[in-house]
Design a protein with these regions (language model features):
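Conserved Walker A/P-loop ATP-binding site and its immediately adjacent core
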Residues: 55, 69-90
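Conserved pre-motif I regulatory segment
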Residues: 1-46
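Residue-level detector of conserved, function-critical positions
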Residues: 420-520
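Conserved interdomain linker/interface between the two RecA-like ATPase lobes of SF2 helicase motors
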Residues: 182-259
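A conserved SF2-helicase RecA2
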Residues: 189-198, 352-406
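Post-DEXD/H (motif II) to motif III coupling segment of the RecA-like Helicase ATP-binding lobe
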Residues: 142-202
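Conserved helicase motor
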Residues: 79-81, 99-106, 114-120, 142-145, ...
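Conserved RecA-like P-loop NTPase helicase motor core
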Residues: 287-383
């Protein structure tokens, strides 16, 4: 078993996970029909795409095996590709696991399983006395599904660890029934500043472009709450739109190789056909593409024999290819998780190209619903089910029904600061000390010199006192909240007054007129 070397932020996350799994296990109870039953502790971990969740997962597995003489480790995922990726990670660290899912009677400590196979064979596993002491769920934002809930219910005493970049659901469902605690890593922008994620440029279609107006008019919704596939295909899978997709790649990512996210396989094939006809070597892939062919195409992409992988829901989770140089979104979405998973594929650093800057080409205006990829997110609220992981359609869209498209020029909304040097943890701490509020066009944001931390969207932001500043929204009826120096919303702006605060608590008055103290 090889020693697992972790970066400082991964080591801290490992220590935090172990602390939760060991300290809470003896005090947590499951209440059923008035009866309390002791269960193992559980924790969900949020780390941005590309920051090494699988390394942390492997380190937790090693910790469990080193400190527990009994109990298997079950690593569970919802897709075969993710299972294979986790097996490769375990191989890298010489962690032995069952070679085949079918080997129920094999005396192994680690099993890597798809949730579909596990549901079919759970009785056989129990009959063979294969009992998990630790259950690890990869891409754990899917754990809200009944199949995972059944797995947790049947193994109450096992420790549970969920790993995800996006602890949120479009339907606003809470994860608290599955995981007691959410542990968060530093925000995406911190990882970019420290050189653990790649910087990026971001271009988006214009507010009054043909394609943005088309997306604005999409009315249908699928069973998952996202845009209806059929309507997206009818409105966006047309020659003029696909030509504009090619034109934007040619203008902003010429000579680069990347990933395109399409609506469905028909759309993907149409894009690939257009790109190939115009000299951009491309292939269309989806979940029905044979696994062998998918692997061959990805390897050809790594060797630069293919310029563009046009995919459908295939590379938004678990795809690890650091030499992706551009991301093109040709499909709109209302899902925050899908948006961040798509753009996150391009932010992995490439050790062979340390000057990598990923170009994100947004041909469907997802930026207008979600903001930039490194925008601070209130993960705690989404984890608890207080906020949906869903894009907010701007209010002006409802007033644009009769607007005529002006032009199809794209707009640069972010340009990477390539002159800035990568920071150590200490340098980042000093950098954040210089964050200050600024005013632009009557609105307030946060910045460090020319670096915009938060775009000017607030009615006012006060000077920082300690690590927090007061933010205000509204004009006649103002509501107050707190921001930290990274722009994270520590206290949502929904209070009538904020009297005072320190690093531990804040005194507020709610709209009900009552004053209260809230722990931070």
């Amino acid at each position: 078993m090889k020693k697992i070397k972790l970066y400082d932020y991964q080591q801290k996350m490992l220590e935090d996970i172990i602390n939760v799994l060991t300290s809470a296990a003896t005090s947590t109870f499951y209440n059923e029909n008035g009866k309390k039953k002791k269960v193992g502790s559980s924790v969900m971990v949020q780390m941005p795409t590309g920051t090494g969740k699988t390394y942390v997962m492997a380190a937790v597995v090693k910790w469990f095996l080193d400190n527990h003489d009994t109990g298997e480790v079950w690593i569970v995922a919802h897709r075969r590709e993710l299972v294979e990726q986790m097996q490769q990670t375990l191989d890298r660290f010489c962690l032995d696991y069952g070679e085949k899912e079918m080997e129920l009677k094999a005396k192994v400590r680690i099993r890597v399983l798809s949730i579909q196979w596990l549901n079919r064979h759970i009785d056989e596993l129990e009959g063979a006395e294969c009992t998990p002491g630790l259950i690890v769920v990869d891409e754990a934002h899917h754990a809200i599904a009944t199949s995972y809930q059944d797995l947790f219910e049947r193994n109450r005493k096992a420790l549970k660890l969920g790993m995800t970049a996006t602890p949120c659901r479009m339907n606003k469902k809470s994860f608290r029934k599955l995981f007691e605690i959410l542990l968060k890593s530093p925000c995406t922008n911190d990882f970019i500043l420290r050189g653990y994620l790649a910087p990026y440029d971001y271009v988006v279609i214009g507010k009054y472009s043909n394609d943005q107006l088309t997306v604005n008019q999409l009315k249908g919704r699928g069973s998952d709450g996202d845009y209806a596939i059929k309507e997206m295909d009818e409105k966006l899978n047309i020659p003029q739109t696909i030509q504009r997709l090619y034109d934007s790649v040619k203008k902003y990512a010429d000579g680069k190789k990347g990933i395109v996210y399409a609506i469905d396989i028909v759309h993907a094939q149409a894009i690939a056909a257009c790109y190939n006809a115009l000299g951009l070597k491309s292939v269309a892939l989806d979940s029905k593409t044979p696994a062998k062919k998918r692997k061959e195409m990805v390897e050809a992409f790594r060797r630069s024999e293919i310029d563009c992988l046009v995919n459908v829901n295939l590379f938004d989770e678990g795809f690890d290819c650091p030499d992706v140089e551009f991301i093109q979104m040709a499909r709109p979405t209302l899902s925050l998780a899908k948006y961040l998973q798509m753009v996150g594929r391009g932010l992995r650093i490439n050790h062979e190209n340390k000057d990598k800057v990923c170009m994100i080409i947004d041909n469907v205006g997802n930026y207008r619903k979600f903001g930039l990829p490194d925008k601070p997110r209130n993960w705690e609220s989404m984890f608890a089910g207080l906020r949906a992981g869903k894009g907010i359609i701007p209010t002006y869209v409802k007033k644009m029904q009769n607007i005529i498209a002006v032009n199809d020029e794209m707009i640069t909304v972010k340009k990477a600061n390539t002159a800035r040097k990568k920071m150590t943890a200490r340098q980042l701490k000093e950098y954040l000390k210089n964050v200050e509020p600024f005013q632009q066009d009557g609105r307030w944001g946060l910045r460090v010199m020319d670096d915009i931390i938060v775009k000017p969207i607030y009615t006012h932001i006060s000077d920082f006192r300690g690590d927090y500043a007061e933010c205000r929204i509204g004009i006649q009826k103002c509501l107050y909240g707190l921001l930290d120096r990274r722009g994270n919303i520590i206290l949502p702006p929904e209070y009538k007054y904020i009297y005072r605060w320190n690093e531990h608590a804040v005194e507020v008055q709610g709209n009900d007129g009552y004053s209260r103290t809230i722990e931070l």
